[in-house]
Amino acid sequence: METHLKAPESSLESYNEPSSCTSEQGVTAQELAKQGEELLSQLHRPLEACTNSCYCKQCSFHCQLCFLKKGLGIWYARKSRRRRTPRKTKTHSSSASDKSISTRTGDSQPTKEQKKTTETTMVTTCSLGR
């Protein structure tokens, strides 16, 4: 039982004729080459002044100068520094000068009375266990 598969004649004819895909590929390759040449010519042109002040995506990429200024976010101009507001003077500074230095900065060594109170609180807290 041998069955021979016979290809339809129309399919054989399509093999002999040049396909339309190859001609389309040639056209697209030519278009790409033209676009590449156009891009290169634009790249080598000097930058022209652009007065567009919009920062939307479309305007940031519409020319090389806008891309360098807006798209990359690089500014070569000198930035102005923000001035800080002067600190407000305290109205209670005279009362602070009356106090001794140790009370303003805090005592690093507790006095005898403070030691006694801390010891008694520790003793009472320790005895509250189970």
From Swiss-Prot:
Gene Ontology terms, MF aspect: RNA binding; RNA-binding transcription regulator activity
Subcellular location: Host nucleus, Host nucleolus
Composition-biased stretches (Polar residues): 11-28, 96-109
Pfam family, one: Tat
UniProt motif Nuclear localization signal, and RNA-binding (TAR): location: 78-90
Ranges where the record places region Cysteine-rich: 50-66
GO BP term, example: positive regulation of viral transcription
Comp. bias (Low complexity): 119-130
Quaternary structure and interacting proteins, as annotated: Interacts with host CCNT1. Associates with the P-TEFb complex composed at least of Tat, P-TEFb (CDK9 and CCNT1), TAR RNA, RNA Pol II. Interacts with CCNT2; the resulting complex is unable to bind to TAR RNA.
Domain writeup: The Arg-rich RNA-binding region binds the TAR RNA. This region also mediates the nuclear localization.
Full protein name: Protein Tat
Species annotation: Human immunodeficiency virus type 2 subtype A (isolate Ghana-1)
Gene: tat
